[in-house]
Amino acid sequence: MKNLAYYVGQEKKDSDDVIGDQYDGVMLMQDMQINIKDIATKNVLVSINAPKATMDFGYMKYPVFCMFRYDERNKLSETTEDGQELFGFSPEQVRYMPEFGDSVLVIKDADEFIRRVATALQKEGLIHARGNVRYFDGNDLEYFQDVKDEPVHTAFWKRKKYSYQQEFRILIDKPIEDHYILNMVLKL
């Protein structure tokens, strides 16, 4: 697992905005007015217009395992006459999929996979957070409230332009410089 800083670096370094998001793991605020006030008088000393401002809560060095989640969002149509449901990839997913590599890992029993990850992390004395990534557009109040209540959720929000990724993430509470390898039991 790479840390969040790795993915941020993908867009900053290579202008790769397919995989990397330069605002991943931080709270992004757009078109903000920042006021600097005198502590004693509460008078505004300086007012600055900021097209973009970020707050970093310290999760950039945390390792994250990112997965595409194939789910009801991939449903192509209503149930067919014979009771089958048709699923497929969106044109955007088809266009960007090759950017993520030439291999795919299919997890058939997601609950069992998560249980094994949690067990392996517990054996190593590590805490983790997991969940679907949510996507926001502009100054989204739900996004701000969620991150205010749980700052670690900055790792579980991305800009709406990345919604085709349909990500599920596991974030480990252990700052690292580059990558982390979790030893766990898998049945093949």
Residue ranges of model-derived segments:
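NAD-dependent ADP-ribosyltransferases
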Residues: 1-188
